[in-house]
Regions:
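Single-stranded nucleic acid-binding surfaces, predominantly the OB-fold ssDNA-binding core
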Residues: 1-125
Length: 125
């Protein structure tokens, strides 16, 4: 089976490092991708926002040492996951996110490629 998402876009906010209740660190990014069409001779832009969670330890460590600032151009490769939560009013909300967590998943800065993290070792051996 294959579940793979690839994005090239721009960060909508500075990267953020968080820690779970059990002490595991992960990073969050918001990435915008755009597509363009011409309608009646005028260019129209359509932007889609993507929530990205990074769990790969080497990439999280790399992000701890720097901030991917708002507006940074990035390449993201991960898997699509669908989540849900219930708000204070009991209303269910559904959303999708891109998760960078396993072999073959990666995050790269396209602004400064020389600073990119080393690829994660293949955890499947």
């Amino acid at each position: 089976m294959l579940n793979k998402a690839q994005l090239i876009g721009f960060t909508g906010a500075d990267s953020e490092i968080r820690t779970t209740l059990k002490g595991k660190k992960y990073a969050l990014l918001r990435v915008a991708t755009s597509r363009y069409t011409k309608k009646e001779g005028e260019r129209q832009d359509f932007t889609t926002w993507h929530q990205v969670e990074i769990w790969s330890p080497g990439t999280v460590k790399w992000l701890e040492g720097r901030v991917l600032a708002k507006g940074s151009k990035v390449y993201v490769e991960g898997e699509i996951r669908h989540e849900q939560y219930t708000d204070d009013k009991g209303q269910k909300h559904y959303f999708a996110k891109i998760v960078v967590a396993g072999p073959g998943h990666e995050l790269k800065s396209l602004d400064r490629p020389e600073t990119n993290p080393e690829p994660e070792p293949d955890e499947e051996g």
